[in-house]
């Protein structure tokens, strides 16, 4: 079903069970096929491909040559009906690729709200991206990667499959991340190493000075004190009783399967 207010260029091709919302625009030479839903006020520019079982929310902007919902690159994939789910107000720039999930995981790839995916960024199968993130030009999110809210993965960086990037973390350009990066941490290099907290990001997002000082203390316990990881965790448990912002660091320490960069 195509809403009567949608503007579809005559050179676009739409086939299958496609739902297009109010005030959506679809540019020339775009191909939309399969079980696709596009929410109200979304702009799909020219030469975009949207396929498979894909749901896109409202007020997104999708630039030329983006490919969304295509088959993933996992050799185990056998054509199962897996999905891509994209939220609202995202900017998906030129040649971004977002692949559908696999049945070996949650069978879906998820992009939240208010994210910027820059030119040629690659979002592999089963990736979960939160809200308000920045994924830089040519950045690669390997299969099953998780990126927390307000995190940044800068240009030409690669995140190894199954790694987690914590909320408000910042991965500098040209980095290779092979283990989890705790929330708030600034990391860079090949292999990526921690270089302090993402202080600029914390200040921009309204963290108060007492919170930032507590997070700096938590960082020092983990990375500068010479303590074992278990000893540092015990110190963070006490700190979290006063500062709730320390809790996400503890949660990732407990849930990490690949270990953290340290």
From Swiss-Prot:
Which GO MF terms are attached to this record?
Answer: acyl-[acyl-carrier-protein]-UDP-N-acetylglucosamine O-acyltransferase activity
- Cellular component GO terms, alphabetical: cytoplasm; membrane
Q: Which reaction does it catalyse?
A: a (3R)-hydroxyacyl-[ACP] + UDP-N-acetyl-alpha-D-glucosamine = a UDP-3-O-[(3R)-3-hydroxyacyl]-N-acetyl-alpha-D-glucosamine + holo-[ACP]
Q: Which GO terms describe its biological process?
A: lipid A biosynthetic process
> Which top-level enzyme class is recorded in the Swiss-Prot or TrEMBL entry?
transferase
Q: Which CDD domains does this entry report, sorted A to Z?
A: LbH_UDP-GlcNAc_AT
Identify the EC number(s): 2.3.1.129
In terms of InterPro entries, this protein maps to:
Acetyltransf_C, Acetyltransf_C_sf, Hexapep, Lipid_A_LpxA, Trimer_LpxA-like_sf
Against SUPFAM superfamilies, the record matches this protein to:
Trimeric LpxA-like enzymes
The answer on whether this UniProt entry bears the keyword Cell cycle reads no
Q: Which key words tag this protein in UniProt?
A: Acyltransferase, Cytoplasm, Lipid A biosynthesis, Lipid biosynthesis, Lipid metabolism, Repeat, Transferase
Q: Does the keyword Lipid biosynthesis apply?
A: yes
Q: Which pathway does this chain act in?
A: Glycolipid biosynthesis; lipid IV(A) biosynthesis; lipid IV(A) from (3R)-3-hydroxytetradecanoyl-[acyl-carrier-protein] and UDP-N-acetyl-alpha-D-glucosamine: step 1/6
Q: Where in the cell is it found?
A: Cytoplasm
- Similarity-based family: Belongs to the transferase hexapeptide repeat family. LpxA subfamily.
Query: Subunit composition?
Result: Homotrimer.
> What's this protein's function?
Involved in the biosynthesis of lipid A, a phosphorylated glycolipid that anchors the lipopolysaccharide to the outer membrane of the cell.
Name of the protein this chain belongs to: Acyl-[acyl-carrier-protein]--UDP-N-acetylglucosamine O-acyltransferase
Native source organism of the sequence: Vibrio atlanticus (strain LGP32) (Vibrio splendidus (strain Mel32))
Q: Which gene encodes it?
A: lpxA
